[in-house]
Curated annotation (Swiss-Prot):
Location of the motif PDZ-binding: 678-681
Description of the deletion phenotype: Morpholino knockdowns show pericardial edema with accumulation of erythrocytes at 28 hpf with no circulating cells present in the trunk vasculature at 48 hpf. Constrictions and lumen narrowing in the dorsal aorta, these defects are not seen in the posterior cardinal vein at 48 hpf. Morpholino amotl2a and amotl2b double knockdowns show significant defects in endothelial cell anteroposterior elongation at 30 hpf. Disrupted organization of radial actin fibers that connect perpendicularly to endothelial junctions at 48 hpf. Pericardial edema is evident at 48 hpf.
Coarse class of the protein's main subcellular location: other
Gene: amotl2b
Similarity annotation: Belongs to the angiomotin family.
PTM summary: Phosphorylation at Tyr-126 is necessary for efficient binding to SRC and synergistically functioning with SRC to activate the downstream MAPK pathway.
Lineage: Eukaryota, Metazoa, Chordata, Craniata, Vertebrata
Tissue: Expressed in endothelial cells.
Coiled-coil annotated residue ranges, if any: 268-319, 362-441, 481-508
Record-given protein name: Angiomotin-like 2b
Residue numbers carrying Phosphotyrosine: Y126
Length: 681
């Protein structure tokens, strides 16, 4: 918004009034500061100075207040406050920073106090004391030149440094010198007894100055001496502080003290009238000295206050210049801000007009935006719902997959267990069939043994009957007996050789059987390990996929069984042919053995132990055949081996004539082999 002219005038008037108020306040503060300087200096001196100078400082302040005139009100208030606060000022007032005047005031008042005599005597004026001191110096220099030269040789350098100061400060020693030499000029009249005391007092004060000068030289700066005041040109600075205090008595003073007349003569020579005159003059000089000291202090304070006021004025002018520059900068900044606000107000008005025109379109867009937001919210809800459904389906599919994997593993385990159980069942069935066949063969063997036993018993009875009957004696019988014995011996040898061959072939058969069993067991274990590794490394595929391979294996096994069955049939035909040949040979031999009935009894007696041995061997062979049936892997090979061995064992007796016991033995072997073949089929 643009500012009006009245507002601008008010702001300018406020700045000008503020500036006037600040300048007036700064002036008042400068006056108050100038009025309080004297009070602060006297307060510092009273607090940290010599306690014996307090009364002197109060007297100086009161005289300055009475003679000041211009600054009567401020100094009076400061003196009243000082007199009121004097007893407890060290406890209540705070320590102010030194202004460079503490040591100066302390030294001035200590000098005033030491130069003032403590009795009510009037001092001569400054001009009289100065002229009289010069006159005395000229009178005393001639008679005491020798002493002064000797003393000045020892302390020449301190005297040269203090000549100018002794001339300016001659009134310090003018009191005692004037009294002494005035008494000498007036005819050596006796003086009062107080002057030696005054002289001694000044000598003691001079020694005290020498002792105090060492401490002031270390602690206080060089100050100005207020007694050498020139009213036209101000006052001159004294020499350095160490030259004022750290000096020895001059040769003139030493000689003056040593050559002064006795105290009794001075008292007798001075008259009472001269004493009163000197006392009055001393009092008047003291008063003048106090007045001049007060004036010098006042002038010094005024100069300091003027300098302080000038410094304050300079700082005030600098502050005013800074304030004016700041006001100008603020004014420029305010004008620039006003212009900017005017320009922005114009632009805002234009924008408001354009906004009014576009308000309807903006409202329509807001409505469309709200509709789109609602649609987006609905779509987001649908998307979130679909995501939840997808997550549910995914979790469900994962659960189904996990269950499928678990069922697959379980089905695989069940399938393996089923295969194992099937194999076990088949093995049990085979064993049961073999057991039944073995039972049948055992029954058949028992039947054969019973028939053989009955036949042998019949033969034995027939032989016993023949032995009981009388036999004819003749050459034919002797020849027949001899021939029968030879035939019997040959048959026995043949039987023994056949038994040895049988035993050898049985051992060979057992060895080959055990070797084949070991080989088949190793192959079976390797196949089982291979199957287990395949099953473990492929847990994901189904068992239904393995069915073709199992069917193929079953088909291979069936084909192998068929081939083995064909081989067995061939062996059966060979066995049947050999049996027929053996039967034809046995029939031819039976016709030759029928006439020898007596020899048959001997043969039967020899054949019975052989038959029993053969029965034992047959039973052992049957047990071995039953053991081969228990091995589930190679029953056919063992049977083929036995069938291969049987022709070899049966081929040898072709060219040999056999006894009936040997025929029965081979019949038993043939029956056992036929029964074993039937069992395996």
């Amino acid at each position: 918004m643009p500012l009006t002219e009245s507002a601008w005038n008010e702001s300018v008037g406020w700045f000008s009034s503020d500036h006037k108020y600040s300048t007036s306040s700064n002036k008042m503060r400068g006056e108050e500061a100038s009025g309080t300087v004297l009070h602060r200096l006297i307060q510092e001196q009273l607090r940290y100075g010599n306690p014996t100078d307090a009364h002197t400082l109060l007297a100086i302040q009161q005289q300055a207040l009475r003679r000041g005139g211009g600054a009567a009100s401020s100094s009076q208030s400061s003196s009243e406050s000082l007199s009121q606060d004097e007893p407890h000022s060290p406890q209540l007032s705070t320590r102010q920073e030194p202004q460079g005047q503490e040591h100066q005031v302390d030294y001035q008042h200590s000098e005033n106090y030491t130069t003032y005599p403590h009795h009510q005597e009037e001092l001569p004026t400054y001009e009289q004391a100065k002229a009289h001191s010069q006159y005395l110096a000229s009178q005393w220099c001639l008679p005491h030149r020798v002493c002064s030269l000797q003393d000045s040789v020892a302390i020449q350098k301190p005297c040269e440094e203090q000549d100018s100061w002794d001339m300016k400060q001659g009134h310090v020693r003018s009191i005692s010198d004037r009294l002494l030499h005035f008494s000498m000029e007036s005819g050596k009249m006796p003086c009062s007894a107080s002057y030696p005391q005054i002289n001694g007092y000044h000598a003691n004060q001079h020694l005290q100055y020498n002792q105090q000068g060492l401490e002031y030289n270390k602690l206080a700066p060089y100050t100005e001496y207020p007694f050498s005041v020139e009213y036209e040109n101000g006052y001159k600075a004294p020499p350095p502080f160490h030259s004022q205090h750290n000096r020895l008595p001059t040769p003139e003073v030493c000689h003056r003290l040593s050559t002064s007349p006795p105290a009794g003569r001075e008292v007798n020579a001075c008259s009472r009238s001269q004493l009163e005159m000197l006392m009055n003059e001393n009092k008047r000089l003291r008063q003048e000295l106090e007045g001049q000291t007060e004036k010098a202090l006042k002038i010094q304070k005024l100069e300091q206050e003027i300098q302080r006021i000038s410094e304050a004025y300079d700082t005030l002018m600098k502050g005013c210049a800074k304030r004016e520059a700041l006001e100008q900068a603020l004014r420029n900044k305010l004008m620039a801000e006003i212009k900017r606000l005017q320009h922005s107000s114009v632009q805002a008005a234009k924008q408001a007009e354009a906004a009014d025109q576009n308000q309807h379109a903006i409202e329509k867009l807001h409505l469309q935006n709200e509709e789109q937001k609602l649609r987006c919210a609905c779509l987001e809800q649908e998307v979130q719902h679909l995501r939840n459904e997808a997550e549910k389906h995914q979790r469900r599919s994962e659960a189904l997959e996990s269950t499928l994997r678990s069922t697959q593993t379980r089905s695989q385990q069940l399938w393996t267990e089923l295969q194992r159980k099937r194999a076990y069942v088949e093995k049990v069935e085979r064993l049961q069939g073999a057991l039944t066949q073995l039972q049948a063969t055992c029954e058949k063997r028992e039947g054969l043994e019973m028939r053989l036993r009955t036949r042998l018993e019949q033969e034995l009875r027939s032989l016993r009957n023949q032995q009981r009957q009388p036999q004819p004696v003749g050459g034919t019988s002797h020849v027949s007996v001899y021939t029968l014995q030879e035939n019997l011996r040959e048959k026995e040898e043949r039987i023994l050789s056949l038994e040895a061959d049988k035993i050898r072939w049985e051992q060979k058969y057992l060895e080959e059987k055990t070797m084949r069993e070991f080989a088949m067991d190793a192959a079976a274990t390797a196949a089982a390990q291979r199957d287990t590794t395949i099953i473990n490394h492929s847990p994901c595929h189904s068992f239904i996929e393995e069915l073709p391979s199992t069917e193929y294996r079953n088909q291979e096994v069936e084909n192998r069984i068929r081939s083995l069955y064909a081989q067995i049939l061939e062996k059966d035909t060979v066995i049947s042919i050999l049996k027929q040949k053996l039967q034809h040979e046995q029939k031819g031999q039976l016709g030759a053995l029928q006439p020898a009935t007596a020899d048959s009894s001997i043969i039967s007696s020899h054949s019975t132990p052989a038959h029993t041995a053969q029965g034992k061997e047959r039973s052992h062979f049957n047990d071995q055949a039953a053991g081969t049936l228990h091995s589930s892997h190679a029953p056919v090979e063992a049977l083929a081996h036995t069938t291969d061995q049987t022709p070899h064992t049966e081929a040898k007796p072709k060219n040999i004539q056999k006894a009936p016991s040997a025929v029965d033995l081979f019949k038993g072997v043939d029956d056992v082999s036929a029964e074993a073949v039937e069992i395996f089929i």
